[in-house]
């Protein structure tokens, strides 16, 4: 909020309201002063917002929703491999891969496939998973037990295609997941 105000946005144009979506969201969405909604989060919540907005009386207002997706990067022979690796590691694994904009699929041109894959495997093996407050940590835990199980089950379903997993030198009973490279065809 401070940065928006510092950039010149009028004070009356932006308010930060914290609270449970079910309690606050419904009230806000039904207020006739609301002329648009921008949302980042789950598809389930975006659907709830869309349904609430569709029941509003009066004009139809726009909804911009950024939800989870299968974001991908295409790598061809003109790409700088070192930059590709940096971008892929940051986008795919930082924030424990939990951003809705996190890289999920890396499509690599055949001519640069082996070099890129080998460098990506090397970089993945260097990732330190650990406590977020330690300077030596690259990646912290996922949000909860369900997220950990969902991710690990996905990895297990592709266990014969795993090309690399960073070491996990922390309590496996907590919410940590190994950053993993899975090779898929087509």
Q: Where are each of the predicted segments found?
A:
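PLP-dependent aminotransferase-like
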Residues: 1-24
